[in-house]
């Protein structure tokens, strides 16, 4: 893929929404291309997160606590929290096909965010919005569970 196509792929990812083109092109150009064989892990739950991956080609099985939780397809962004901070991966991602990725390390993201502060702020805003929406969804589920408990007491 070309840098322009890869930058457009990045733009389709929610945390890069509303970001300027130039920092996305820089990330697309400098991201390390990695290929994974069938059955090879891109990331392993509990291991130190070192990078995020944009899935360019192929499919990836996703597991959490040894249970299948889904399949990622091209355009998926895996391990986004690794890009912005340290910590362990929350899932295991295993190649189902031969997989091509663009690997975005924490260091790469920080360099681009330092050079383009508006880019870093836009990503932070998008992540904050995602976190807010996740908390709202959890609150909705909590209310539903509370109601179901009250109903079961009848």
Regions found by a protein language model. Give the residues of each.
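Cytosolic regulatory regions built on CNB/CRP/Popeye-like sensor folds
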Residues: 1-154
């Amino acid at each position: 893929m070309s840098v322009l196509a890869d930058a457009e792929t990045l733009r389709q990812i929610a945390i890069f929404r509303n970001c300027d083109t130039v920092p996305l092109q820089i990330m697309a150009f400098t991201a390390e291309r990695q290929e994974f064989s069938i059955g090879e892990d891109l990331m392993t739950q509990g291991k130190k997160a070192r990078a995020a991956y944009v899935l360019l080609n192929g499919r990836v099985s996703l597991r959490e606590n040894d249970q299948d939780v889904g399949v990622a397809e091209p355009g998926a962004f895996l391990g986004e929290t690794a890009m912005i901070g340290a910590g362990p991966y929350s899932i295991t991602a295993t190649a189902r096909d031969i997989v091509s990725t663009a690997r975005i390390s924490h260091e790469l993201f920080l360099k681009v965010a330092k050079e383009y502060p508006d880019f870093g702020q836009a990503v932070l805003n998008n992540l904050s919005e995602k976190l807010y929406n996740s908390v709202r969804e959890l609150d909705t589920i909590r209310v539903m569970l509370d109601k179901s408990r009250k109903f079961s007491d009848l």
